[in-house]
């Protein structure tokens, strides 16, 4: 079983992340699922009628605005980082938290590495599914890499000069 970082601790993964090519006929009624955006668009009524938990995941080329009106439907929103160098979903995280008021779990998935976690957390992420070859316990320490931050962000809306 995969382990993820959630709310500053390492826990067992309990959600099933469905791939983009998943067949909707194979969906369980009671499992907790994180579905790709396209599957949500095509089958939202059926997905909402299930008994299990519901989440959605966006790829880096998909926009937060596409689910802005639906965020209350999801317990989890996962944002995919296809490469360490692709930072587009940092912006989506800020939009989901600050503009759309998403209060559920915001999870980073894909090519997620230790060096990114502190900055992802500042943008509103509270869960991290690290790349399979990385140790979540070691990566957890990165959330304490810096004790003071200067600019405002989702995790601290006041810049340092306003906190005095």
Predicted regions and their residues:
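Glycine-rich beta-to-alpha transition loops that act as phosphate-gripper elements at the mouths
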Residues: 60, 106-114
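Active-site-adjacent beta->alpha loops and helix N-cap segments on the catalytic face
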Residues: 39-46, 84-96, 137-145
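Glycine/Thr-rich beta-alpha phosphate-binding loop at enzyme active sites
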Residues: 53-96
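Catalytic cores of alpha/beta
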Residues: 56, 65-69, 114-127
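Glycine-rich phosphate-binding active-site loops on the catalytic face of alpha/beta enzymes
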Residues: 125-143
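C-terminal helical cap(s) of enzyme catalytic domains, especially alpha/beta-barrels
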Residues: 137-164
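Short beta-strand/loop segments at the ligand-binding rim of alpha/beta enzyme cores
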Residues: 49-56, 95-108
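A positional/architectural concept
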Residues: 10-58
